[in-house]
Amino acid sequence: MSAEKQKYGVHSEAGKLRKVMVCSPGLAHKRLTPSNCDELLFDDVIWVDQAKRDHFDFVTKMRERGVDVLEMHNLLTDIVQQPEALKWILDRKITSDTVGVGLTNEVRSWLEGLEPRHLAEFLIGGVAGQDLPVSEGAEVIKMYNKYLGHSSFILPPLPNTQFTRDTTCWIYGGVTLNPMYWPARRQETLLTTAIYKFHKEFTGADFQVWYGDPDKDHGNATLEGGDVMPVGKGIVLIGMGERTSRHAIGQLAQNLFEKGAAEKIIVAGLPKSRAAMHLDTVFSFCDRDLVTVFPEVVKEIKPFIITPDSSKPYGMNIAPQDASFLEVVSEQLLGKKDKLRVVETGGNSFAAEREQWDDGNNVVALEPGVVIGYDRNTYTNTLLRKAGIEVITISAGELGRGRGGGHCMTCPIVRDPIDY
């Protein structure tokens, strides 16, 4: 008799966090320079050794609270030892479109000859002209280095893997494989998909794929996990702004409704700006009924509700809401008698804008009433503590340079529901 598969899924934003995936800073971050960090979506270069220490502290503090933390480099190291998994990755990652005609065989051969840990590091960290021995591709590599420079990338690095929240999102009993907005991030989804497809942590688990396929061109449909929050009661909050498009939201809603995975989507129409690139940069749950928000953006959110309706075109009803976003979320979760408690970004207008920029509202809940946030957001952390929230702090000096806090740096895989 076969063992019953473990059920994976995320059923709230503040219930007990059981299992999570992270990605430590590494080679990809050592590739960041003042001339390329903007293209790679970082605001500045980072001190990588310190960032690694700070990230280890982040992981340690989660583990101390009983969270099973999976690290992406380790997961990739495991699966590239499987010939089938390695072939699946390289067939998609090393092509004429990605590395150019004349280098596919050479780059692939070189990668296949690496030790598994080094191979995993290069899959995330990218391959520069100086990495590949001249003996591999001889004349082509010599020409490449001469005209493009030793630091030019044959495969670009993926430093934003640090923000595992975005590439996939677990919604109740399944997961989405997200088509990312920026080209600099699209290869991240491929690697995460490989982990779900081949790693024993996931091959022995029970879950469904709701949406997305890294082998498919999704066109204008883009979806990122920082915009997606399964909050409970069959409700999913989805931000629609800079990174997540209406095209993807509509398709995801259809799929969730058809499979009975969700009952209602609350869409948050966000202003398009880097400071509010995702919903979780201005709004996150800290407890069953407490959220932290950046009011300057949240008050501008235009909410509407999508519900299944077989009498409507495409099987859905879309209803704009007159009430504010916070009022809509509060009523849908708590009913009309209770209201969400709201902690706004702290300090005067200057301090609040600075703390939002430094991810003061981007905290991750480990259980109801316990969150991890950046130490530098002293005003907001103080207000959260006064509201009864335990705030565990980590250093923001290096980790925050890519514009992401504890919420962004975690991809919850198993999280308990909350009783509403």
Curated annotation (Swiss-Prot):
Catalytic activity: L-arginine + H2O = L-citrulline + NH4(+)
One Pfam family of this chain: ADI
Leader peptide range in chain numbering: none
Record EC number: 3.5.3.6
Compartments where located: Cytoplasm
Listed GO biological process terms: arginine catabolic process to ornithine; arginine deiminase pathway
Assembly and binders: Homodimer.
Protein's recorded name: Arginine deiminase
Gene name in the database record: arcA
